[in-house]
A protein has these predicted regions:
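Conserved redox-active cysteine motifs that mediate thiol-disulfide chemistry
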Residues: 73, 81-98
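A short beta-strand-turn-helix
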Residues: 56-77, 101
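Structural microenvironment flanking redox-active thiols in thiol-disulfide oxidoreductases
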Residues: 91-132, 142-149
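N-terminal targeting signals for export/organelle localization
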Residues: 1-53
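Active-site acidic short loop of glycosyltransferases
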Residues: 73-75, 105, 134-135, 152
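Hydrophobic beta-strand anchors of alpha/beta hydrolase catalytic cores
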Residues: 78-79, 110
């Protein structure tokens, strides 16, 4: 009887140690995972520098629909700041239209933010787009808030964002179709 009691005690001790060890291991993995998530969250910086998450905005399409940048999360983005009176902007727009058409359905979006505050009127911009048969999405920055947030000093200025909204490239001046493809392919 004593032998059986000793065996049971040993078995209970082994079970207790195993449970305690298993609990400790699981807790350490969960804690480590939480610390990694917290660390990743703390390292996110919103801004306009390379490696930052691009600042969100709320602007209107040419049809008056409100759009946030975050509406495009999960897609690579060519974010372009321009105006209809800007000569270099006019030079890059045919390439941007071709890029937009070629990338449709491939998880890549073109978003052209018009510096509407510097234009004659939104109707003038609509007319410019229609006359040139541009079909890529255009957003009106009527108050100039997006241009200010993104610290746009000259136009055209373009940002290349990955699917998480992180800025990988900033290009000041007109871009060619080849530039656009090269930037996107490097993501």
């Amino acid at each position: 009887m004593v032998k059986g009691g000793i065996i049971i005690k040993k078995w209970l001790i082994i079970c207790f140690i195993s449970i305690a060890l298993g609990y400790t291991i699981i807790q350490n993995f969960l804690l480590k995972d939480k610390e990694e998530q917290k660390s990743q969250t703390e390292n996110i910086t919103i801004g306009t520098e390379l490696g930052n998450v691009a600042p969100n905005f709320l602007l209107q399409t040419v049809d008056g629909k409100e759009v946030h940048l975050t509406d495009y999360k999960g897609k690579k983005i060519l974010l372009n700041f321009w105006a209809s009176w800007c000569g270099p902007c006019k030079i890059e727009m045919p390439d941007m239209e071709k890029f937009y058409i070629d990338m449709k359905g491939k998880g890549i979006e073109v978003i052209a933010i018009n510096a509407t505050a510097s234009e004659k009127s939104p109707d003038h911009v609509k007319q410019f787009l229609q006359e040139n048969k541009y079909t890529f999405p255009v957003l009106f920055d009527i108050q100039g808030q997006a241009n200010a947030t993104y610290q746009i000093m000259s136009i055209p200025t373009s940002f290349i964002l990955d699917e998480k909204g992180i800025i990988h490239f900033k290009h000041v001046g007109p871009m060619t179709y080849e530039n656009m493809v090269k930037y996107m392919d490097s993501l």
